[in-house]
Amino acid sequence: MELLDVIKRPVITEKSMLAMDEKKYTFEVDTRANKTLVKQAVESAFDVKVANVNILNVRPKFKRMGKYAGYTKKRRKAIVTLTEDSKEIQLFEAAE
């Protein structure tokens, strides 16, 4: 698996935005990725030092649309904590 394929997208929620003040960034990652791969991918993509990686699996939810029923996709989230001397990740860059 390539390092660029590990990180899918940042998770943008109120809780994840508040965690950014403590240098904790939440990403949706590939379901096959482990902590070591996530750490290498974040360090190479954003040029930062990673202190800790926590991973959690999000189970699929049952959804119904009229008579059709199914499940959402299972996901995997990674909460990446940066070191104190590391620079911040700019997820939202202002276009000038």
UniProtKB/Swiss-Prot annotation:
Spans traversing the lipid bilayer: none
Keyword rRNA-binding annotated: yes
GO cellular component labels: ribonucleoprotein complex; ribosome
Signal peptide segment: none
InterPro entries to which the protein is assigned, alphabetical: Nucleotide-bd_a/b_plait_sf, Ribosomal_uL23-like, Ribosomal_uL23/eL15/eS24_sf, Ribosomal_uL23_CS
Function: One of the early assembly proteins it binds 23S rRNA. One of the proteins that surrounds the polypeptide exit tunnel on the outside of the ribosome. Forms the main docking site for trigger factor binding to the ribosome.
Protein's name in the database: Large ribosomal subunit protein uL23
